Amino acid sequence: YTATRDNCCILDERFGSYCPTTCG
């Protein structure tokens, strides 16, 4: 899953939902 400016938060099966600092 690649984070984008429109969708920063990621829903991962193992790690759960999180927002990478590399967003934007």
UniProtKB/Swiss-Prot annotation:
Task: Provide the GO biological process annotations.
Answer: platelet activation; protein polymerization
Chief location: secreted
Highest taxon listed in the record's lineage? Eukaryota
Pfam families hit by this protein = Fib_alpha
CC per GO annotation? fibrinogen complex
Record localization: Secreted
What GO MF annotations does this protein's record show? signaling receptor binding
User: For this protein, what post-translational modification is recorded in UniProt?
Assistant: Conversion of fibrinogen to fibrin is triggered by thrombin, which cleaves fibrinopeptides A and B from alpha and beta chains, and thus exposes the N-terminal polymerization sites responsible for the formation of the soft clot. The soft clot is converted into the hard clot by factor XIIIA which catalyzes the epsilon-(gamma-glutamyl)lysine cross-linking between gamma chains (stronger) and between alpha chains (weaker) of different monomers.
| InterPro entries the record matches | Fibrinogen_a/b/g_coil_dom
Listed A to Z, the keywords are: Blood coagulation, Coiled coil, Disulfide bond, Hemostasis, Secreted
Protein purpose: Together with fibrinogen alpha (FGA) and fibrinogen beta (FGB), polymerizes to form an insoluble fibrin matrix. Has a major function in hemostasis as one of the primary components of blood clots. In addition, functions during the early stages of wound repair to stabilize the lesion and guide cell migration during re-epithelialization. Was originally thought to be essential for platelet aggregation, based on in vitro studies using anticoagulated blood. However, subsequent studies have shown that it is not absolutely required for thrombus formation in vivo.
Fill in the subunit field for this protein. Heterohexamer; disulfide linked. Contains 2 sets of 3 non-identical chains (alpha, beta and gamma). The 2 heterotrimers are in head to head conformation with the N-termini in a small central domain.
The free-text domain remark for this protein reads: A long coiled coil structure formed by 3 polypeptide chains connects the central nodule to the C-terminal domains (distal nodules). The long C-terminal ends of the alpha chains fold back, contributing a fourth strand to the coiled coil structure.
Q: What is the name attached to this protein's record?
A: Fibrinogen gamma chain
**What species is given as this protein's source?**
Canis lupus familiaris (Dog)
